[in-house]
Amino acid sequence: VWLIGLMQGVTQTPLCIDSPNAKLLARILEEGHVARPGMVNSVNEEGDKCETIFPLIAGTPWHVVGLTCDRDGIPADPEKKIDIAKRIIDKADKYGVALNQLHIDPCVMAIATMPTSMKDFERCIRGIHEYAPTVKVTGAISNISFDMPARKYVNMNCMAYAIAAGLDSAIMDPCNMDMIGTIYACEALTMKDTGGKNILRAYRQGRFGVKK
């Protein structure tokens, strides 16, 4: 709690409150420690986390991350991940949480141990959007490159494939110019940035590319 106060003293950026302890997250929400609602990270289908957090953020500006895991852990089968996501989405809707404030994280696995990870990630993105088009899908992109050489190339290509599949956001370093360039390029290529206005503006602002 002391860290929340410290951070709010130096930035106007909404905070992401991160803890595996749902009761701690609930306490922070109930006691009003956060001045500018940001994101709660996270809920899942293990225990009663959804039931604890969703009633507290319903009707508020808070966003929330939902992990596709349950009491048995993270399933390897993408269809099981999608089923968990559906249960989280249904509970969010039941408690009145706006679905466009729910961000499902399909828990990206490393290709070093699960070669189908990229294909599975794409399947999850599409499957979640098919079930609930307004729900956001996010993911920790760098998870996919654990134990791989020159990890940034794996990460950049993972980002490209994921955006093409419909990824809405990513857990990543926002100062990584290579990844920022990949995002802008993919949005132009997939017609999310029609005419390339955003990529041109970002390049001129020095957000990616060679610094002059």
Stretch-by-stretch model annotation:
Residues 211-212:
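Long amphipathic alpha-helical segments
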Residues 20, 33-52, 88:
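Phosphate/diphosphate-binding loops
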Residues 59-208:
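Catalytic alpha/beta core domains of metabolic enzymes, predominantly
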Residues 9, 29, 33-36, 49-75:
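Glycoside hydrolase catalytic-domain context in secreted enzymes
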Residues 1-35, 118-139:
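Alpha-helix-loop-beta-strand connector modules within alpha/beta enzyme cores
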Residues 16, 39-41, 65-66, 171:
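Conserved beta-strand positions in the central sheet of alpha/beta enzyme cores
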Residues 16-24, 43-48, 140-146, 152-153:
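Glycine-rich beta-to-alpha transition loops that act as phosphate-gripper elements at the mouths
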